[in-house]
């Protein structure tokens, strides 16, 4: 087994040597390519006016500045060429025309075939986003992964850059950023749940209380049942009349309801006549009979009547 591993590990050495030889071959190929460029068999393009002018100027500038790079010399020569007037460019343009005519005469079958230069873009140049969203070298995510605070800071910076890129205002976007930033902290989830519990408790208690009052109103055969539907705009009156009936029952009731029954019972006398005359079967009876019905309703509300059914429910004889 170790022998097999040794035999498997040995070949990379010669391969590296062969790779170096391949590199040497590539170097030789490049050298041959350079030789082909400089070879007399290769037909060059005729020089244009700028090349005719820059041929002497380049040599002169290279002698004056021996440490200057060729690309910098080309930039300066191009800037100087643009500053020249047409009269100064004219002799070089004429010389370029003469060289072109001579080139066409010597090489009638010549056709310029430009070779496409493939520009290899770097990774960060390919995927860079506007506004500097990615840090140089792609280290923004790597620096923020270790610590949660660092990740939140990197996210906030990127969100700010997104906000400026999309044209959002700082005020409106900061609210959204705060909403997104709160759940990042692990301790805030339990705190948020603890804050949400009292609200749910209040809602459930209110629902239970409403269901209790509605069920008690439905079970009692009293004018409260008709009054709760006749006048929905006065919930205090309905609550007060219901409290008086619940007080007469044997079951326990909330103390708030009983206190409201004493405070709001006098307000009901004026409106009971209209409601009873509207919803009771004897509504067609003339007006003098209404006080008797009002007295009967108040008698039922005051206390339990002997001979009634279980739990103090009121009889329906007045119907």
UniProtKB/Swiss-Prot annotation:
The knockout outcome noted for this protein's gene is: Embryonically lethal.
Motif 9aaTAD, residue numbers: 274-282
DNA-binding region(s), residue ranges: 43-111
Query: Mind listing the UniProt keywords for this protein, alphabetically?
Result: Activator, Cytoplasm, Developmental protein, DNA-binding, Isopeptide bond, Methylation, Nucleus, Phosphoprotein, Transcription, Transcription regulation, Ubl conjugation
Write down the SUPFAM superfamilies for this protein, in alphabetical order: HMG-box
What induces this one? By SRRT.
Q: Where in the cell is it found?
A: Nucleus; Cytoplasm
Q: Which GO terms describe its biological process?
A: adenohypophysis development; anatomical structure formation involved in morphogenesis; cell fate commitment; cell fate specification; cellular response to cadmium ion; cerebral cortex development; detection of mechanical stimulus involved in equilibrioception; detection of mechanical stimulus involved in sensory perception of sound
Molecular-function GO terms, alphabetical: chromatin binding; chromatin DNA binding; DNA binding; DNA-binding transcription factor activity; DNA-binding transcription factor activity, RNA polymerase II-specific; DNA-binding transcription factor binding; RNA polymerase II cis-regulatory region sequence-specific DNA binding; RNA polymerase II-specific DNA-binding transcription factor binding
Q: What's one GO-annotated cellular component?
A: cytoplasm
Application in biotechnology: POU5F1/OCT4, SOX2, MYC/c-Myc and KLF4 are the four Yamanaka factors. When combined, these factors are sufficient to reprogram differentiated cells to an embryonic-like state designated iPS (induced pluripotent stem) cells. iPS cells exhibit the morphology and growth properties of ES cells and express ES cell marker genes.
| PTM comment | Sumoylation inhibits binding on DNA and negatively regulates the FGF4 transactivation.
What residue spans carry the Low complexity bias annotation?
248-263
The domain comment in this protein's record states: The 9aaTAD motif is a transactivation domain present in a large number of yeast and animal transcription factors.
Q: Give the record's subunit note.
A: Interacts with ZSCAN10. Interacts with SOX3 and FGFR1. Interacts with GLIS1. Interacts with POU5F1; binds synergistically with POU5F1 to DNA. Interacts with DDX56. Interacts with L3MBTL3 and DCAF5. The interaction with L3MBTL3 and DCAF5 requires methylation at Lys-44 and is necessary to target SOX2 for ubiquitination by the CRL4-DCAF5 E3 ubiquitin ligase complex. Interacts with RCOR1/CoREST. Interacts with PHF20L1. The interaction with PHF20L1 requires methylation at Lys-44 and Lys-119 and protects SOX2 from degradation. Interacts with TRIM26; this interaction prevents ubiquitination by WWP2.
Role? Transcription factor that forms a trimeric complex with POU5F1 (OCT3/4) on DNA and controls the expression of a number of genes involved in embryonic development such as YES1, FGF4, UTF1 and ZFP206. Binds to the proximal enhancer region of NANOG. Critical for early embryogenesis and for embryonic stem cell pluripotency. Downstream SRRT target that mediates the promotion of neural stem cell self-renewal. Keeps neural cells undifferentiated by counteracting the activity of proneural proteins and suppresses neuronal differentiation. May function as a switch in neuronal development.
Q: What is this protein called?
A: Transcription factor SOX-2
Q: Which organism is it from?
A: Mus musculus
Name the lineage.
Answer: Eukaryota, Metazoa, Chordata, Craniata, Vertebrata
